[in-house]
From Swiss-Prot:
E.C. code: 4.2.1.9
Enzyme class: lyase
Keywords per UniProt: 2Fe-2S, Amino-acid biosynthesis, Branched-chain amino acid biosynthesis, Iron, Iron-sulfur, Lyase, Magnesium, Metal-binding
Cofactor: [2Fe-2S] cluster; Mg(2+)
Top-level taxonomic group: Bacteria
The family this protein is said to belong to: Belongs to the IlvD/Edd family.
Subunit structure of this chain's protein: Homodimer.
Binding, [2Fe-2S] cluster: C52, C125, C197
Record GO terms (molecular function): 2 iron, 2 sulfur cluster binding; dihydroxy-acid dehydratase activity; magnesium ion binding
Protein name: Dihydroxy-acid dehydratase
Reaction equation(s) it catalyzes: (2R)-2,3-dihydroxy-3-methylbutanoate = 3-methyl-2-oxobutanoate + H2O; (2R,3R)-2,3-dihydroxy-3-methylpentanoate = (S)-3-methyl-2-oxopentanoate + H2O
Native source species: Streptococcus pneumoniae (strain ATCC BAA-255 / R6)
Pathway involvement of the protein, from the record: Amino-acid biosynthesis; L-isoleucine biosynthesis; L-isoleucine from 2-oxobutanoate: step 3/4; Amino-acid biosynthesis; L-valine biosynthesis; L-valine from pyruvate: step 3/4
Amino acid sequence: MTELDKRHRSSIYDSMVKSPNRAMLRATGMTDKDFETSIVGVISTWAENTPCNIHLHDFGKLAKEGVKSAGAWPVQFGTITVADGIAMGTPGMRFSLTSRDIIADSIEAAMSGHNVDAFVAIGGCDKNMPGSMIAIANMDIPAIFAYGGTIAPGNLDGKDIDLVSVFEGIGKWNHGDMTAEDVKRLECNACPGPGGCGGMYTANTMATAIEVLGMSLPGSSSHPAESADKKEDIEAAGRAVVKMLELGLKPSDILTREAFEDAITVTMALGGSTNATLHLLAIAHAANVDLSLEDFNTIQERVPHLADLKPSGQYVFQDLYEVGGVPAVMKYLLANGFLHGDRITCTGKTVAENLADFADLTPGQKVIMPLENPKRADGPLIILNGNLAPDGAVAKVSGVKVRRHVGPAKVFDSEEDAIQAVLTDEIVDGDVVVVRFVGPKGGPGMPEMLSLSSMIVGKGQGDKVALLTDGRFSGGTYGLVVGHIAPEAQDGGPIAYLRTGDIVTVDQDTKEISMAVSEEELEKRKAETTLPPLYSRGVLGKYAHIVSSASRGAVTDFWNMDKSGKK
């Protein structure tokens, strides 16, 4: 930590020549006394379009109260969100990952443009979390991320359901196992109120990872959206960020290599989303921390999967909260040598000091399995390599009984075409469905394939049909799925030259993803193939021309590798 004036940025408004600036600020309510205090931004991704974010404006008010009670001047801002569950399976899904970097850039622009001394970022939907963290890492001023909390499970006929239940219901309906009225009942009961999607999906995965990194208050990631604990932790975030100012504590003090190792460790233990690979790489890049896909495999080999959480398990994230939450899991892992307990966090305390204040996992609970009898002996997120993905691909194998799948490819250049093939029963057991030209550049925006994967699972083919793509998968996806194939088709990766009927192998034990196509044949196909032009209009056009490979986090500022002098 370094000495940091509590008004290290807002003091720019003190001089006589800044009288016009102060005149504008007085119109917002500031007085002479307020100009003597720190200015703290509170920025949220509030929007009325999704349960993930609908409550965040009110949470922003709570964070402001926390800032004010700590003696600083709070200012509330807003930025965008794209709701994955609403965009899923539509052209809007191309804007989901794109929004991550728009969120990051807009937070940086708003906070830097108004010379705040510190800020709290509040998010709810999937890309809100990494977008906020990229901005926090790039700006490197005192900041805390506060999660809007997980949604409560829906209930139908005495059973817990969630949004993924509805997606899978479509496959069951198409297969004749569910009526349209049954699906409607799922639809009307799956989402009972505000909060991020309820399983160990991307929102909860990233909120957890940020808490483990040390950039959210201990315990906050597992507090349900409608709980009293959540309201308390949001207000506490406002107080805590002022304390960070007083301590001179910055994100660069917290976001160390060890912090990212711990975030990956807990992600593996809880069975987190494949999107964690993409987002942690991007956050590490912004934080100037050297992190690669191979680091995920290294940690995957030594960390068991312990959580019986959806999508592959039976419990939702609120159930984890009720048996001790993320701190209890971290405490268990720390006691068994899996975490770095001596690193600093946003509280000014170490990980071990924070966890000492929390209880252990509730005795007799069933959500987290013991280390001696885990759900899986190693981690469920695996990085695959081979001639189909020379730069890597990501598979989530929790709940997948098939360890090796060899079958003929059925190749599609869009998710829509693949969905149509599933609905018309063109996909048979043993097939390898391949959706390409949907990567970061090709999509553009690397859309998720939850609609497609859920239909395959709903039709009873989840363990019988493999699904491969250079796009992404929702955290709600499970089954024989491999995403993030790199290089992507749009960049001329081998997946661009795969043809229907080619034999594809996916092996989780050897971490292989390959196609039975010779180098000579591959070169011949390259000569015969013309790749489509990059998208060229609007925000997607900008994104397609600057985004990096998924194997590097799909970031949009890779031209400055060392980023020296950037901050």
